[in-house]
Amino acid sequence: MVSVGTQSHSGRDQAEQNPSVENVRYDWQLDEALAIYNLPLLELIGRANSVHRRYHDAGHLQKSSLLSIKTGGCPEDCGYCSQSAHHDVELTREKLMNPTAVIGLAAKAKKAGAERFCMGAAWRKVRDGKEFDAVLEMIRGVRALDMEACVTLGMVNEDQARRLAEAGLTAYNHNLDTGPAYYPQIVSTHSYQDRLETLAKIRDAGIALCTGGIIGLGESPRDRVEMLVVLAGMNPHPESVPVNMLVPIEGTPLADADPVDPLEIVRMIATARLMMPQSMVRLSAGRSTLSRETQILCLVAGANSIFYGNVLLTTPNADMAADDALLEALGVTAE
């Protein structure tokens, strides 16, 4: 099969004449993916935009809302995370929220224009009992609002994945963060294989996967692309691929990480779009640090979802009024 990044002129002509030409692949190699990532930026964005328009409505953007339903005290030692109990961070720990309160906030998010409601709990893994039952109630309540429901709860077993599916869960977020070679530099309390096994259990239960990563962790471009190769090797591809920029937080090991050129997130989004053309590519954490122009480049390169709201778990997000003005200026519909 001819790849998006290396197809011949005849292959490109055929694709342009026939929008239904299949370009979805699961056999990406690291070297060819790196070659795509390192294309001249304008060529990379142009190719990604062409694929984006072939598979998606370029005039539509999904708004998602994200809520921390249980904050702080996580036993994992992820180097970027303010919620880890291993780090000396000024953060107020909060117990699991009441389902009624969560569903009420979901209703407000829907009224503000959000289509998907995401809920995050700072757990290593799900434990059966009252708290998990409460999360299932939250999911059912969000779905009753005719919203998509996504949760991130840590590791799950097969039975828990089944119960999440029965509650109507739309998607489960479990990020790979970076490539497998660099992953041990970020966290030591679980392995890359642990992440992949949880994703497999979620997929086996029939729940859509939301899994992506973070740039700015001290990784190399090769590490970033290595993660994309892992994701693009999943058949089918993840339904959602969030792309985050590190938000340095005082007290975490990565508080003083060197900043990344914002155009690197544009490259990441464009490469993800080319490698996983049918997936939702979500411009996620760190967006508040990007200029208006860089955000527009991300959308042109293939991002078709943003988080809408002033806070993402424990980090700031882009201003809602500024988002409204940006979307109006672009002339895109968002929900």
From Swiss-Prot:
It catalyses: (4R,5S)-dethiobiotin + (sulfur carrier)-SH + 2 reduced [2Fe-2S]-[ferredoxin] + 2 S-adenosyl-L-methionine = (sulfur carrier)-H + biotin + 2 5'-deoxyadenosine + 2 L-methionine + 2 oxidized [2Fe-2S]-[ferredoxin]. SUPFAM superfamilies: Radical SAM enzymes. Its EC number is 2.8.1.6. The keyword S-adenosyl-L-methionine applies. GO terms for biological process: biotin biosynthetic process. The keyword Membrane does not apply. Pathway: Cofactor biosynthesis; biotin biosynthesis; biotin from 7,8-diaminononanoate: step 2/2. Homodimer. Catalyzes the conversion of dethiobiotin (DTB) to biotin by the insertion of a sulfur atom into dethiobiotin via a radical-based mechanism. This is Biotin synthase. The gene is bioB.
